């Protein structure tokens, strides 16, 4: 099981196509920083032939921590992708809601002079 091979398949995560994977001090563990959020992926210390994926938000809270057996298996790999994509979608949706709320607020406070 090759950690880097699995990680390389996760590369197109950001909108601009860039990813900043870096190694951590733990053996066979890598992290991806997306804004203030960090995704860790590495070999599981609890399960044989498995990966641990942990998503940490900007203030250090663990958003999700999952163990996936043999991500080379297409079903497990798609679950791994879905987990990360769902997290990114939730973050994106949150920001879109904030933007929408601000626009609504501006519309209500704007006086139109005819």
Each PLM stretch: what is its role?
Residues 1-22, 58-114:
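Mixed-charge, Lys/Arg-enriched low-complexity segments
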Residues 19-59:
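Amphipathic, interaction-prone secondary-structure segments
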């Amino acid at each position: 099981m090759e950690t880097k091979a699995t990680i390389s398949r996760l590369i197109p995560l950001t909108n601009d196509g860039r990813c900043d994977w870096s190694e951590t001090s733990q053996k066979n563990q890598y992290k991806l920083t997306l804004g203030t959020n960090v995704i860790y992926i590495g070999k599981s210390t609890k399960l044989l032939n498995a990966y641990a994926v942990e998503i940490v938000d900007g203030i250090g809270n663990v958003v999700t921590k999952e163990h996936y057996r043999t991500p080379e298996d297409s079903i497990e790999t798609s679950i791994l992708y879905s987990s990360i994509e769902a997290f990114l979608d939730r973050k994106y949706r949150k920001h879109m809601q904030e933007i929408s709320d601000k626009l609504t607020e501006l519309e209500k406070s704007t006086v139109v002079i005819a």
